């Protein structure tokens, strides 16, 4: 089938016409409707995807894959989906990932306690279920429980004390929450229970580096010198930066990007080059056209209505476990997939602005992570909203999964609530939380309706403010596939 072949090759747009023709000829074929739903989902057209899956479900209500797909697209579109996930669980009872999706749907419908209870019940039945422990830890952290958020792991380890994967996940959750001091005794317990393991050595090296224990961290990283793993490479680069070993940092970063020109080393290499006075940083980030500032006020829905829509989906009480938010909340899921009119209008305005920005970028530069040859189509690796309140901010961070990243301001504190002239401003090119004494490359004042676009490899954060609300939309533009 031409449509299925196109889908397998990643050519979803080319698949729409043949699938539509096939549906016209065979409107009672549930699999065709399912395939149409998957294609529209990949194209981020969730309204059409939901319609296609609804038709597939009517034609074949007891098919497990159709039921699961239908539940997923309803959830992603921002529609009630818990009942659909209930059906999917009944049809595929062994698939515990559906249970986690059902829990997420319950949270989206305001039933956080029910979601926690559901995961807890399954963990009682299956105490070694790692994904369940991780999900529960994230839920408890976002609910504000930063002390006991990991308690379910202890219950799991009572049942499976020598499960190395469970110990690794336990340690990793502490690292995600930047609870490095608490991670160290868990690492020692893990070694005592299951023996030496590379993951425990990496976790200890990372924790001691982040805690500023540079002598111990240095010994550990030297013992791990032959490890070739992208995540480990980033930990090592952070250590070298914190330790002030700039020549080693530059050499390691250059070696890493030579292996993978879209890898995670660029943000650290930029800082190293700037601190060393190496003007290659200008090739990487110095061109002013890489950053764009756009006023979308006329293209967006009324900002008050958009702000109300966004506030309604900020359901957590606290910052997420493994994100840059401090003193605020972040929405779950892919914001731009939702089908509310305000969100669809928002997405359209953003796509047009990104297209304008990409069109004015300089020509391709060999090896450059942003200035690549093929720059379309525009798609999104993720999209979300952040709501910061008094004292809230983003610590300096980067987005390794993106090509272009962003900040779109929807609501801001009144000027009378700002403690300093630059309170809440966006900073680009600064990594102060890593002990780096470098000024930002650029600072940008937030204004309602203002969109800022910048390379995903560029460090960015925000200055804190004392009071009021800062409501933003953020997204990562997906890096277009390049010709092989």
Where are these regions (language model features)?
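Canonical tetratricopeptide repeat
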Residues: 1, 35, 69-70, 101, ...
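Canonical positions in the second alpha-helix
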Residues: 21-22, 55-56, 87-89, 121-122, ...
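Short coil turns that delineate tetratricopeptide repeat
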Residues: 27, 61, 93, 127, ...
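Catalytic core of non-heme Fe(II) oxygenases with the double-stranded beta-helix
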Residues: 341-351, 355-453, 458-464, 468-484
């Amino acid at each position: 089938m031409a449509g299925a072949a196109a889908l397998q090759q990643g050519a979803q747009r080319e698949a729409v016409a043949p699938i539509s023709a096939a549906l016209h000829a065979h409107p009672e074929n549930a699999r065709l409707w399912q395939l149409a739903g998957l294609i529209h989902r990949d194209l981020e057209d969730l309204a059409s995807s939901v319609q296609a899956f609804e038709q597939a479900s009517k034609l074949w209500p007891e098919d497990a894959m159709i039921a699961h797909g239908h539940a997923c697209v309803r959830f992603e579109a921002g529609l009630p989906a818990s009942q659909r996930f209930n059906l999917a669980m009944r049809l595929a009872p062994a698939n515990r990932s559906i249970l986690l999706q059902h829990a997420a749907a319950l949270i989206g419908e305001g039933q956080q306690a029910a979601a926690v209870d559901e995961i807890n019940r399954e963990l009682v039945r299956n105490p070694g279920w790692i994904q369940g422990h991780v999900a529960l830890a994230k839920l408890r952290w976002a609910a504000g429980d930063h002390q006991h958020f990991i308690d379910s792991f202890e219950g799991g380890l009572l049942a499976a004390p020598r499960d190395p994967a469970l110990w690794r996940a336990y340690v990793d959750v502490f690292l995600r929450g930047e609870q490095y001091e608490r991670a160290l005794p868990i690492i020692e317990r893990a070694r005592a229970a299951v023996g030496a393991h590379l993951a425990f050595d990496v976790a200890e090296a990372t924790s001691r580096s982040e805690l500023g224990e540079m002598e111990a961290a240095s010994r550990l990283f030297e013992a791990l010198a032959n490890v070739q793993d992208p995540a480990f490479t980033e930990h090592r680069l952070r250590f070298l930066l914190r330790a002030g070993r700039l020549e080693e940092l530059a050499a390691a970063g250059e070696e890493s990007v030579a292996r993978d020109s879209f890898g995670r080393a660029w943000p650290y290499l930029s800082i190293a080059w700037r601190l060393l006075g190496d003007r290659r940083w200008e090739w990487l980030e110095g061109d002013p056209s890489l950053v764009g500032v756009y006023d979308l006020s006329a293209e967006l829905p009324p900002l008050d209505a958009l702000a109300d829509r966004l506030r309604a989906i900020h359901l957590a009480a606290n910052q997420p476990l493994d994100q840059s938010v401090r003193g605020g909340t972040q929405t779950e899921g892919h914001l731009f997939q939702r089908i509310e009119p305000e969100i669809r209008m928002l997405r359209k305005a953003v796509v047009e602005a990104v297209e304008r920005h990409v069109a004015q970028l300089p020509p391709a530069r060999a090896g450059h992570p942003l200035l690549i040859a093929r720059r379309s189509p525009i798609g999104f690796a993720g999209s979300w909203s952040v709501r910061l309140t008094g004292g809230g901010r983003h610590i300096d961070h980067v987005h390794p999964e993106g090509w272009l990243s962003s900040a779109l301001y929807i609501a801001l504190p009144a000027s009378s609530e700002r403690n300093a002239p630059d309170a809440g401003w966006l900073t680009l090119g600064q990594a102060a939380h890593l002990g780096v004494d470098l000024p930002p490359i650029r600072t940008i004042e937030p204004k309602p309706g203002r969109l800022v676009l910048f390379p995903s490899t560029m460090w960015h954060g925000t200055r804190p403010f004392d009071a009021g609300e800062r409501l933003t939309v953020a997204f990562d533009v997906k890096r277009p596939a390049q010709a092989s």
